[in-house]
Protein backbone atom coordinates (compact mmCIF):
# COMPACT_ATOMS: atom_id res chain seq x y z
CA UNK A 1 0.00 0.00 0.00
CA UNK A 2 2.98 2.24 0.75
CA UNK A 3 4.15 1.82 -2.86
CA UNK A 4 0.68 2.42 -4.30
CA UNK A 5 0.27 5.60 -2.27
CA UNK A 6 3.76 6.74 -3.25
CA UNK A 7 2.98 6.10 -6.94
CA UNK A 8 -0.27 8.07 -6.76
CA UNK A 9 1.49 10.95 -5.02
CA UNK A 10 4.26 10.90 -7.65
CA UNK A 11 1.60 11.06 -10.40
CA UNK A 12 0.02 14.07 -8.69
CA UNK A 13 3.42 15.77 -8.48
CA UNK A 14 4.11 15.07 -12.15
CA UNK A 15 0.86 16.79 -13.19
CA UNK A 16 1.63 19.72 -10.87
CA UNK A 17 5.09 20.00 -12.50
CA UNK A 18 3.35 20.07 -15.87
CA UNK A 19 0.98 22.77 -14.61
CA UNK A 20 3.96 24.86 -13.50
CA UNK A 21 5.54 24.40 -16.92
CA UNK A 22 2.44 25.54 -18.83
CA UNK A 23 2.87 28.85 -20.61
CA UNK A 24 -0.81 29.59 -21.28
CA UNK A 25 -3.99 29.37 -19.24
CA UNK A 26 -5.55 27.23 -21.95
CA UNK A 27 -2.82 24.59 -21.47
CA UNK A 28 -3.49 24.53 -17.73
CA UNK A 29 -7.24 24.23 -18.22
CA UNK A 30 -6.69 21.22 -20.46
CA UNK A 31 -4.78 19.51 -17.66
CA UNK A 32 -7.41 20.26 -15.01
CA UNK A 33 -9.62 17.12 -15.47
CA UNK A 34 -6.56 14.84 -15.20
CA UNK A 35 -5.34 16.79 -12.18
CA UNK A 36 -8.69 16.46 -10.39
CA UNK A 37 -8.78 12.72 -11.12
CA UNK A 38 -5.22 12.30 -9.79
CA UNK A 39 -6.17 14.22 -6.62
CA UNK A 40 -9.24 11.98 -6.15
CA UNK A 41 -7.23 8.80 -6.74
CA UNK A 42 -4.65 9.81 -4.15
CA UNK A 43 -7.11 10.97 -1.47
CA UNK A 44 -9.35 7.90 -1.94
CA UNK A 45 -6.32 5.64 -1.52
CA UNK A 46 -5.52 7.37 1.79
CA UNK A 47 -9.13 7.04 2.96
CA UNK A 48 -9.18 3.38 1.96
CA UNK A 49 -6.31 2.70 4.37
CA UNK A 50 -8.26 4.44 7.15
CA UNK A 51 -11.57 2.70 6.37
CA UNK A 52 -9.90 -0.69 6.59
CA UNK A 53 -9.18 0.00 10.28
CA UNK A 54 -12.57 1.52 11.15
CA UNK A 55 -14.08 -1.70 12.61
CA UNK A 56 -10.92 -2.19 14.70
CA UNK A 57 -11.17 1.35 16.10
CA UNK A 58 -14.83 0.83 17.05
CA UNK A 59 -13.93 -2.43 18.78
CA UNK A 60 -10.91 -0.92 20.61
CA UNK A 61 -12.87 2.10 21.85
CA UNK A 62 -15.65 -0.20 23.15
CA UNK A 63 -13.06 -2.36 24.96
CA UNK A 64 -11.39 0.70 26.45
CA UNK A 65 -14.69 2.07 27.78
CA UNK A 66 -15.64 -1.30 29.27
CA UNK A 67 -12.26 -1.74 31.00
CA UNK A 68 -12.31 1.87 32.21
CA UNK A 69 -15.77 1.40 33.79
CA UNK A 70 -14.68 -1.84 35.44
CA UNK A 71 -11.56 -0.18 36.92
CA UNK A 72 -13.52 2.83 38.17
CA UNK A 73 -16.12 0.59 39.81
CA UNK A 74 -13.49 -1.44 41.67
CA UNK A 75 -11.63 1.69 42.82
CA UNK A 76 -14.93 3.04 44.13
CA UNK A 77 -15.88 -0.27 45.79
CA UNK A 78 -12.56 -0.39 47.64
CA UNK A 79 -12.99 3.21 48.79
CA UNK A 80 -16.54 2.44 49.95
CA UNK A 81 -15.29 -0.62 51.83
CA UNK A 82 -13.09 1.57 54.05
CA UNK A 83 -16.03 3.87 54.72
CA UNK A 84 -18.24 0.91 55.73
CA UNK A 85 -15.64 -0.43 58.18
CA UNK A 86 -15.24 3.04 59.70
CA UNK A 87 -19.03 3.28 60.07
CA UNK A 88 -19.18 -0.14 61.72
CA UNK A 89 -16.30 0.88 63.99
CA UNK A 90 -18.20 4.01 65.03
CA UNK A 91 -21.33 1.90 65.68
CA UNK A 92 -19.38 -0.51 67.88
CA UNK A 93 -17.86 2.41 69.79
CA UNK A 94 -21.30 3.89 70.42
CA UNK A 95 -22.60 0.44 71.43
CA UNK A 96 -19.73 -0.01 73.88
CA UNK A 97 -20.38 3.41 75.40
CA UNK A 98 -24.11 2.70 75.67
CA UNK A 99 -23.36 -0.63 77.32
CA UNK A 100 -21.08 1.02 79.89
CA UNK A 101 -23.78 3.60 80.70
CA UNK A 102 -26.35 0.82 81.11
CA UNK A 103 -24.18 -0.97 83.73
CA UNK B 1 0.93 -24.95 78.85
CA UNK B 2 4.37 -23.69 77.81
CA UNK B 3 4.29 -25.92 74.69
CA UNK B 4 0.88 -24.52 73.72
CA UNK B 5 2.15 -20.94 74.03
CA UNK B 6 5.27 -21.78 71.95
CA UNK B 7 3.08 -23.38 69.27
CA UNK B 8 0.79 -20.36 69.18
CA UNK B 9 3.79 -18.05 68.80
CA UNK B 10 5.16 -20.21 65.95
CA UNK B 11 1.79 -20.14 64.15
CA UNK B 12 1.52 -16.40 64.64
CA UNK B 13 5.01 -15.83 63.22
CA UNK B 14 4.24 -18.06 60.21
CA UNK B 15 0.97 -16.22 59.56
CA UNK B 16 2.73 -12.86 59.88
CA UNK B 17 5.44 -14.00 57.42
CA UNK B 18 2.81 -15.08 54.88
CA UNK B 19 1.04 -11.76 55.22
CA UNK B 20 4.25 -9.79 54.69
CA UNK B 21 5.23 -11.91 51.66
CA UNK B 22 1.76 -11.46 50.20
CA UNK B 23 1.99 -7.71 50.67
CA UNK B 24 5.42 -7.55 49.03
CA UNK B 25 4.15 -9.41 45.91
CA UNK B 26 1.09 -7.22 45.74
CA UNK B 27 3.19 -4.06 46.08
CA UNK B 28 5.42 -5.19 43.17
CA UNK B 29 2.37 -5.69 40.92
CA UNK B 30 0.93 -2.34 42.01
CA UNK B 31 4.25 -0.58 41.32
CA UNK B 32 4.56 -2.15 37.87
CA UNK B 33 0.95 -1.22 37.12
CA UNK B 34 1.58 2.34 38.39
CA UNK B 35 4.65 2.63 36.12
CA UNK B 36 2.66 1.23 33.17
CA UNK B 37 -0.21 3.64 33.88
CA UNK B 38 2.20 6.61 33.87
CA UNK B 39 3.72 5.49 30.57
CA UNK B 40 0.26 4.90 29.11
CA UNK B 41 -0.89 8.38 30.15
CA UNK B 42 2.15 9.91 28.47
CA UNK B 43 1.77 7.97 25.22
CA UNK B 44 -1.98 8.67 25.02
CA UNK B 45 -1.23 12.41 25.28
CA UNK B 46 1.38 12.12 22.52
CA UNK B 47 -1.07 10.18 20.37
CA UNK B 48 -3.86 12.74 20.89
CA UNK B 49 -1.50 15.61 19.96
CA UNK B 50 -0.22 13.69 16.95
CA UNK B 51 -3.66 12.99 15.46
CA UNK B 52 -4.89 16.52 16.27
CA UNK B 53 -1.85 17.95 14.48
CA UNK B 54 -2.37 15.67 11.48
CA UNK B 55 -6.04 16.67 11.27
CA UNK B 56 -4.97 20.34 11.34
CA UNK B 57 -2.46 19.60 8.57
CA UNK B 58 -5.24 18.19 6.38
CA UNK B 59 -7.34 21.32 7.10
CA UNK B 60 -4.34 23.38 5.98
CA UNK B 61 -4.01 21.21 2.86
CA UNK B 62 -7.63 22.10 1.97
CA UNK B 63 -6.80 25.82 2.27
CA UNK B 64 -3.62 25.37 0.22
CA UNK B 65 -5.45 23.37 -2.49
CA UNK B 66 -7.98 26.19 -2.66
CA UNK B 67 -5.18 28.74 -3.15
CA UNK B 68 -3.47 26.52 -5.71
CA UNK B 69 -6.69 26.10 -7.67
CA UNK B 70 -7.24 29.86 -7.75
CA UNK B 71 -3.64 30.49 -8.85
CA UNK B 72 -3.65 27.77 -11.52
CA UNK B 73 -7.23 27.84 -12.86
CA UNK B 74 -8.81 31.00 -11.38
CA UNK B 75 -11.56 28.77 -10.06
CA UNK B 76 -12.41 27.14 -6.67
CA UNK B 77 -11.08 23.65 -6.01
CA UNK B 78 -13.21 20.74 -7.17
CA UNK B 79 -15.96 19.90 -4.65
CA UNK B 80 -15.39 16.13 -4.86
CA UNK B 81 -11.70 16.57 -3.95
CA UNK B 82 -12.72 18.76 -1.01
CA UNK B 83 -15.23 16.07 0.09
CA UNK B 84 -12.51 13.40 0.06
CA UNK B 85 -10.22 15.62 2.13
CA UNK B 86 -13.05 16.21 4.61
CA UNK B 87 -13.53 12.43 4.84
CA UNK B 88 -9.84 12.14 5.73
CA UNK B 89 -10.35 14.68 8.52
CA UNK B 90 -13.36 12.71 9.82
CA UNK B 91 -11.24 9.55 9.90
CA UNK B 92 -8.53 11.38 11.83
CA UNK B 93 -11.17 12.70 14.26
CA UNK B 94 -12.06 9.05 15.04
CA UNK B 95 -8.40 8.45 15.88
CA UNK B 96 -8.30 11.54 18.11
CA UNK B 97 -11.32 10.12 19.98
CA UNK B 98 -9.57 6.74 20.25
CA UNK B 99 -6.42 8.37 21.69
CA UNK B 100 -8.57 10.31 24.18
CA UNK B 101 -10.31 7.08 25.24
CA UNK B 102 -6.86 5.59 25.85
CA UNK B 103 -6.07 8.59 28.06
CA UNK B 104 -9.23 8.04 30.14
CA UNK B 105 -8.42 4.35 30.46
CA UNK B 106 -4.88 5.21 31.63
CA UNK B 107 -6.37 7.55 34.27
CA UNK B 108 -8.69 4.81 35.60
CA UNK B 109 -5.81 2.30 35.58
CA UNK B 110 -3.58 4.75 37.43
CA UNK B 111 -6.33 5.47 39.99
CA UNK B 112 -6.56 1.79 40.92
CA UNK B 113 -2.78 1.21 40.85
CA UNK B 114 -2.11 4.26 43.03
CA UNK B 115 -5.23 3.95 45.18
CA UNK B 116 -4.52 4.05 48.92
CA UNK B 117 -7.67 2.01 49.56
CA UNK B 118 -5.65 -0.83 51.11
CA UNK B 119 -4.08 1.56 53.64
CA UNK B 120 -7.42 3.25 54.32
CA UNK B 121 -9.11 -0.11 54.87
CA UNK B 122 -6.24 -1.30 57.04
CA UNK B 123 -6.56 1.82 59.21
CA UNK B 124 -10.34 1.46 59.39
CA UNK B 125 -10.04 -2.27 60.23
CA UNK B 126 -7.45 -1.45 62.90
CA UNK B 127 -9.87 1.03 64.39
CA UNK B 128 -12.68 -1.54 64.34
CA UNK B 129 -10.47 -4.15 65.98
CA UNK B 130 -9.53 -1.66 68.71
CA UNK B 131 -13.19 -1.02 69.38
CA UNK B 132 -13.91 -4.76 69.45
CA UNK B 133 -11.02 -5.25 71.85
CA UNK B 134 -12.58 -2.80 74.28
CA UNK B 135 -15.61 -5.08 74.56
CA UNK B 136 -14.66 -7.01 77.69
CA UNK B 137 -15.79 -10.60 76.93
CA UNK B 138 -14.22 -10.74 73.43
CA UNK B 139 -11.42 -13.33 73.40
CA UNK B 140 -8.13 -13.02 71.52
CA UNK B 141 -5.97 -10.64 73.43
CA UNK B 142 -3.78 -7.84 72.16
CA UNK B 143 -2.79 -9.56 68.88
CA UNK B 144 -6.23 -9.04 67.33
CA UNK B 145 -5.89 -5.37 66.27
CA UNK B 146 -2.58 -5.91 64.47
CA UNK B 147 -3.73 -9.10 62.76
CA UNK B 148 -7.04 -7.65 61.60
CA UNK B 149 -5.33 -4.55 60.28
CA UNK B 150 -2.62 -6.41 58.35
CA UNK B 151 -4.97 -9.14 57.14
CA UNK B 152 -7.49 -6.67 55.78
CA UNK B 153 -4.74 -4.73 54.01
CA UNK B 154 -3.44 -7.98 52.53
CA UNK B 155 -6.92 -9.02 51.44
CA UNK B 156 -7.56 -5.70 49.71
CA UNK B 157 -4.12 -5.80 48.05
CA UNK B 158 -4.89 -9.32 46.88
CA UNK B 159 -8.19 -8.21 45.35
CA UNK B 160 -6.52 -5.17 43.79
CA UNK B 161 -3.60 -7.23 42.50
CA UNK B 162 -5.94 -9.74 40.84
CA UNK B 163 -7.98 -6.95 39.31
CA UNK B 164 -4.83 -5.12 38.15
CA UNK B 165 -3.50 -8.29 36.52
CA UNK B 166 -6.82 -8.93 34.78
CA UNK B 167 -7.11 -5.29 33.66
CA UNK B 168 -3.45 -5.21 32.59
CA UNK B 169 -4.14 -8.21 30.37
CA UNK B 170 -7.05 -6.40 28.69
CA UNK B 171 -5.12 -3.11 28.45
CA UNK B 172 -2.10 -4.91 26.99
CA UNK B 173 -4.29 -6.28 24.18
CA UNK B 174 -5.82 -2.85 23.59
CA UNK B 175 -2.45 -1.07 23.39
CA UNK B 176 -1.07 -3.78 21.10
CA UNK B 177 -4.13 -3.32 18.87
CA UNK B 178 -3.60 0.44 18.72
CA UNK B 179 0.11 -0.02 18.03
CA UNK B 180 -0.58 -2.45 15.17
CA UNK B 181 -3.18 -0.13 13.68
CA UNK B 182 -0.83 2.86 14.00
CA UNK B 183 2.01 0.95 12.33
CA UNK B 184 -0.26 -0.11 9.45
CA UNK B 185 -1.29 3.51 8.83
CA UNK B 186 2.18 5.08 9.06
CA UNK B 187 2.54 5.35 5.23
CA UNK B 188 -0.73 7.31 5.10
CA UNK B 189 0.31 9.65 7.96
CA UNK B 190 3.68 10.41 6.38
CA UNK B 191 2.09 10.83 2.96
CA UNK B 192 -0.50 13.33 4.26
CA UNK B 193 2.26 15.38 5.84
CA UNK B 194 4.35 15.25 2.68
CA UNK B 195 1.33 16.28 0.59
CA UNK B 196 0.70 19.37 2.76
CA UNK B 197 4.37 20.43 2.56
CA UNK B 198 4.56 19.86 -1.19
CA UNK B 199 1.40 21.79 -2.01
CA UNK B 200 2.62 24.60 0.27
CA UNK B 201 5.92 24.62 -1.65
CA UNK B 202 4.00 24.84 -4.94
CA UNK B 203 1.88 27.77 -3.76
CA UNK B 204 4.90 29.55 -2.26
CA UNK B 205 6.87 29.01 -5.48
CA UNK B 206 4.02 30.40 -7.59
CA UNK B 207 3.65 33.47 -5.33
CA UNK B 208 7.39 34.03 -5.53
CA UNK B 209 7.20 33.72 -9.31
CA UNK B 210 4.50 36.40 -9.39
CA UNK B 211 6.70 38.60 -7.22
CA UNK B 212 4.13 39.13 -4.48
CA UNK B 213 6.36 37.86 -1.66
CA UNK B 214 8.39 39.92 0.80
CA UNK B 215 11.63 37.94 1.12
CA UNK B 216 12.96 40.29 3.83
CA UNK B 217 12.13 37.94 6.77
CA UNK B 218 14.25 35.21 5.11
CA UNK B 219 17.29 37.46 5.59
CA UNK B 220 16.64 37.83 9.34
CA UNK B 221 19.09 35.11 10.47
CA UNK B 222 21.94 37.10 8.89
CA UNK B 223 20.76 40.57 9.93
CA UNK B 224 19.07 40.08 13.34
CA UNK B 225 22.33 39.49 15.31
CA UNK B 226 23.46 43.01 14.25
CA UNK B 227 20.07 44.69 14.87
CA UNK B 228 19.61 45.18 11.13
CA UNK B 229 16.50 44.64 8.97
CA UNK B 230 16.13 44.07 5.24
CA UNK B 231 15.41 47.13 3.11
CA UNK B 232 12.09 46.80 1.21
CA UNK B 233 12.66 46.31 -2.52
CA UNK B 234 11.51 49.38 -4.47
CA UNK B 235 10.15 47.62 -7.57
CA UNK B 236 10.73 43.91 -7.76
CA UNK B 237 12.63 41.19 -5.93
CA UNK B 238 15.99 40.49 -7.49
CA UNK B 239 16.67 37.14 -9.17
CA UNK B 240 19.26 36.28 -6.50
CA UNK B 241 16.76 36.89 -3.73
CA UNK B 242 14.13 34.78 -5.44
CA UNK B 243 16.59 31.94 -5.96
CA UNK B 244 17.59 32.15 -2.33
CA UNK B 245 13.93 32.04 -1.25
CA UNK B 246 13.30 29.01 -3.49
CA UNK B 247 16.18 27.16 -1.87
CA UNK B 248 14.83 28.07 1.58
CA UNK B 249 11.35 26.79 0.62
CA UNK B 250 12.81 23.52 -0.64
CA UNK B 251 15.11 22.92 2.34
CA UNK B 252 12.61 23.91 5.03
CA UNK B 253 10.03 21.64 3.41
CA UNK B 254 12.42 18.68 3.33
CA UNK B 255 13.39 19.26 6.97
CA UNK B 256 9.72 19.40 7.98
CA UNK B 257 9.00 16.11 6.19
CA UNK B 258 12.00 14.41 7.83
CA UNK B 259 11.08 15.66 11.30
CA UNK B 260 7.50 14.50 10.96
CA UNK B 261 8.63 11.07 9.76
CA UNK B 262 11.01 10.79 12.74
CA UNK B 263 8.26 11.86 15.17
CA UNK B 264 5.91 9.25 13.65
CA UNK B 265 8.47 6.44 14.04
CA UNK B 266 9.27 7.59 17.58
CA UNK B 267 5.58 7.48 18.54
CA UNK B 268 5.29 3.98 17.12
CA UNK B 269 8.23 2.92 19.32
CA UNK B 270 6.65 4.64 22.37
CA UNK B 271 3.40 2.73 21.79
CA UNK B 272 5.33 -0.54 21.65
CA UNK B 273 7.20 0.37 24.87
CA UNK B 274 3.92 1.18 26.65
CA UNK B 275 2.50 -2.14 25.50
CA UNK B 276 5.59 -3.96 26.89
CA UNK B 277 5.35 -2.10 30.20
CA UNK B 278 1.72 -3.16 30.62
CA UNK B 279 2.76 -6.75 29.85
CA UNK B 280 5.20 -6.51 32.78
CA UNK B 281 2.28 -5.75 35.08
CA UNK B 282 0.48 -8.82 33.70
CA UNK B 283 3.51 -10.84 34.76
CA UNK B 284 4.09 -12.70 31.50
CA UNK B 285 6.59 -10.39 29.82
Regions found by a protein language model. Name each.
Chain B
Residues 54, 58-68, 72, 109-116, ...:
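Secondary-structure edge/capping motif, primarily at the C-terminal ends of alpha-helices
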Residues 35, 39-42, 46-49, 53, ...:
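Charged, amphipathic alpha-helical oligomerization/scaffolding segments
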Residues 223-285:
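Extracytoplasmic/luminal low-complexity segments enriched in Pro/Gly and acidic/polar residues
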Residues 31-143:
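N-terminal Sec/ER secretory leader and immediately downstream segment
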Amino acid sequence: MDDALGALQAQLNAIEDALDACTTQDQRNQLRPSYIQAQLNYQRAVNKIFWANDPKITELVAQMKQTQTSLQELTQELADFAKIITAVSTAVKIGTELASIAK
Amino acid sequence: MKAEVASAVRHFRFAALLLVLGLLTACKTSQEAADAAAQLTNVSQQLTSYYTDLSNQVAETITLQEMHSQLMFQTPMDSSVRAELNTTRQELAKRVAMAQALGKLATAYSALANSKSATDISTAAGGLASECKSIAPLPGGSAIPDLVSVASQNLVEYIRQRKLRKSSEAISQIVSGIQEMFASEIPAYKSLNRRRVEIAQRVAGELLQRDVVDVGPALAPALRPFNLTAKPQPNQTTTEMRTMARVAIQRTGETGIEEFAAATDSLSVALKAASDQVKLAVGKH
